[in-house]
């Protein structure tokens, strides 16, 4: 074979150009240099004639999806509230993690959280202290009367009687009203009046029928208030703490629920938490004032043969005054007793 001619096997040998584009873009001519194949058609010596085939370009419908996939959409615009939340999240991530506290996982009691009123009432307060002092003074005044110390007994009765107004005023002024105080206040009055009346009856300074009306009515009122309060607990003694609501106990909560159920069933307030305060009546307050005035009149009459009464009323009329106080006291005693009985039947004895 002549040197200027090529071998026949080389005349039509195809040569394929390899593109340097990535494989994903290699088939798209719009993005890469043209690719194609060539044929050796001849040549002499070192000269080779190459006939290049036309380049193959990808169709348009195949190129558009790739262009869309390469397009990066702009970041969405956040509103002011979203930006604020994002800033808060960044600040929280920067804060150091607090140590785990097991007490934070404790769930509060349902009865304590749902109750609108405090589960326990204050007991050790100034109004209750005044009531306790009046209660203790009753036996002391009675003892002085039996011993014949009318002057000291009269002064102590005046101070104790004034304390009946003082403890109520302090409770309202200080906001220290309580279930325990609503029972302690009238109980102290009854103990004071009962002890003085019993001592005067022993000395013969007070008629028996007046003492019977006064003391009998007070005993019935005190006993009745406790009975109706106990009915609110389903006739079961819950303990003194739950009865007077002085501490927060499960028994008190159970008694309150029982009292509410019994109150609804009986059509009245049975003494549960919602109606636990003993309701004082105006006629009962007037009766207490008349009783104290009557006892004071007996003490003045018994002081040195009636010298105290003559000192109070120099012009006379002391006996007539005492007789009028006896009638007024007896009338208001009976009226207040009937009023309390009616309220108890109607379920309105407690508030």
Swiss-Prot record:
Enzyme Commission code(s) on record: 2.7.8.41
Pfam families, per the entry: CDP-OH_P_transf
EC category: transferase
One Gene Ontology term of the molecular function aspect: cardiolipin synthase (CMP-forming)
Entry keyword annotation includes Transmembrane helix: yes
Membrane topology designation: Multi-pass membrane protein
GO-annotated cellular components: mitochondrial inner membrane; mitochondrion
Membrane-spanning residues: 139-159, 191-211, 251-271, 280-300, 321-341
Catalysed reactions listed for this entry: a CDP-1,2-diacyl-sn-glycerol + a 1,2-diacyl-sn-glycero-3-phospho-(1'-sn-glycerol) = a cardiolipin + CMP + H(+)
Main location: mitochondrion
Composition-biased stretches (Low complexity): 76-120
Keyword annotations of the record: Lipid biosynthesis, Lipid metabolism, Membrane, Mitochondrion, Mitochondrion inner membrane, Phospholipid biosynthesis, Phospholipid metabolism, Transferase, Transit peptide, Transmembrane, Transmembrane helix
Chain segments carrying region Disordered: 74-120
Cofactor(s) it depends on: Mn(2+)
Paired cysteines (S-S): none
Gene Ontology biological process terms in this record: cardiolipin biosynthetic process
Compartment list: Mitochondrion inner membrane
Function: Catalyzes the synthesis of cardiolipin (CL) (diphosphatidylglycerol) by specifically transferring a phosphatidyl group from CDP-diacylglycerol to phosphatidylglycerol (PG). CL is a key phospholipid in mitochondrial membranes and plays important roles in maintaining the functional integrity and dynamics of mitochondria under both optimal and stress conditions. Cannot catalyze the phosphatidyl group transfer from one PG molecule to another to form CL.
Family indicated by similarity: Belongs to the CDP-alcohol phosphatidyltransferase class-I family.
Full protein name: Cardiolipin synthase (CMP-forming)
Naturally occurring in which organism (per UniProt): Chlamydomonas reinhardtii
């Amino acid at each position: 074979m002549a040197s200027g001619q090529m071998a026949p096997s080389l005349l039509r040998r195809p040569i394929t150009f390899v593109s340097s584009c990535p494989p994903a873009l290699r088939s798209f001519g719009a993005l890469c240099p043209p690719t194609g194949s060539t044929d050796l058609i001849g040549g002499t010596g070192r000269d080779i004639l190459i006939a290049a085939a036309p380049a193959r370009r990808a169709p348009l419908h195949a190129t558009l999806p790739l262009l869309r996939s390469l397009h990066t959409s702009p970041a969405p615009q956040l509103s002011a509230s979203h930006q604020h939340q994002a800033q808060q999240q960044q600040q929280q991530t920067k804060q150091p993690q607090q140590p785990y506290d097991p007490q934070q996982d404790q769930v509060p009691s349902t009865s304590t959280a749902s109750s609108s009123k405090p589960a326990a009432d204050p007991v050790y307060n100034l109004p209750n202290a005044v009531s306790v002092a009046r209660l203790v003074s009753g036996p002391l005044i009675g003892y002085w009367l039996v011993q014949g110390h009318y002057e000291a007994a009269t002064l102590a009765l005046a101070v104790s009687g004034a304390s009946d107004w003082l403890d109520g005023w302090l409770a309202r002024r200080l906001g220290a009203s309580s279930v325990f105080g609503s029972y302690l206040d009238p109980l102290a009055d009854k103990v004071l009046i009962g002890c003085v009346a019993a001592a005067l009856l022993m000395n013969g300074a007070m008629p028996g029928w007046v003492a019977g009306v006064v003391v009998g009515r007070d005993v019935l009122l005190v006993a009745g208030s406790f009975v109706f309060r106990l009915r609110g607990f389903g006739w079961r003694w819950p303990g003194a703490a739950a009865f007077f609501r002085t501490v927060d106990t499960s028994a008190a909560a159970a008694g309150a629920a029982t009292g509410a159920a019994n109150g609804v069933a009986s059509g009245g307030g049975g003494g549960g938490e919602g109606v636990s305060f003993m309701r004082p009546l105006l006629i009962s307050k007037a009766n207490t004032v008349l009783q104290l005035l009557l006892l004071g009149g007996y003490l003045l009459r018994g002081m040195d043969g009636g010298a105290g009464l003559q000192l109070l009323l120099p012009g006379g009329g002391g006996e007539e005054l005492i007789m009028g106080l006896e009638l007024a006291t007896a009338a208001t005693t009976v009226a207040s007793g009937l009023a309390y009985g009616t309220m108890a039947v109607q379920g309105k004895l407690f508030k």
